[in-house]
């Protein structure tokens, strides 16, 4: 079976595939025009974030059985087109939870303690900045979580248990029964209430039509002037123009961004000129340990499909009822007899 990698993945995952006699092809680059001809013979595709697998590409993938995302998001896959084609789409929900949570907490602390500003001051001979008392504690403060899935929950847990922070969450999609499990330490509230009461606001929602520009001018006007905003979900959730204005006008104290509306970030993006922002290049989940976990789990999903087994975290379970999937299962079952 042929497995296509639009971008390189960890050697541990490639070894896993090759041990099962898969032929692994890595594209020279993740451009659509490069990947398209390689899709013709691919049975499995392991996908990172460097390319969007759109309808046009999927229509050329006649042999493709599975698209396996290394991460949890599916905004770079046309799931509807894949479903129509009978292609299983899987994601890696939960695999990057701890790594992303650690990254977010690092940003919260770095912004609150003004680490980058103080580091630059010392390097430039301004040791006297210590008398300005710029750092702030987070202990006992309030963190607001936009989205209370795995990552949001983990960040809230750490902030509550370690820093004695009050936790407010906004998640209209979380069932009431599930919310009840957390009410001993989480207050679920409407968005406006969360924004007005939180000292730290951290975003953990997927990018959809409903969440695009979820945070804009109106939302920034509700925030405390000493609040900090963290976004490690998707760039489009925050209106960057409104964010720049809020930072320039001191509507909020600072922001930590791992994601952007356009990636890579253009050289003329005004965020690059602001001192009250920490920017990282979409690396919250890209620790050595996490990328290995994500790649190997994505490879396991591909192998499960090849073996006729239902993989984990199927985004389009209706494909499992299709004739194509039933025939694959029957074929693999007969081979094992």
Predicted regions and their residues:
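Rossmann-like dinucleotide-binding domain for NAD(H)/NADP(H)
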Residues: 89, 226-337
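Phosphate-binding beta-alpha-beta segment of Rossmann-like dinucleotide-binding domains, i.e.
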Residues: 85, 93-142, 154-158, 162, ...
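Short glycine-/small-residue-rich Rossmann-like dinucleotide-binding loops
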Residues: 50, 72, 199, 205-207, ...
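An N-terminal-biased, well-structured beta-alpha scaffold segment characteristic
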Residues: 1-90, 196, 216, 222, ...
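Rossmann-like dinucleotide/phosphate-binding beta-alpha-beta segment
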Residues: 132-225, 336-337
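Beta-strand-loop-alpha-helix segment that lines the small-molecule cofactor/substrate pocket
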Residues: 58, 62-65, 77-89, 203, ...
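Structural/interface elements that position substrates and couple domains in central-metabolism enzymes
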Residues: 2-3, 22-26, 97, 168-170, ...
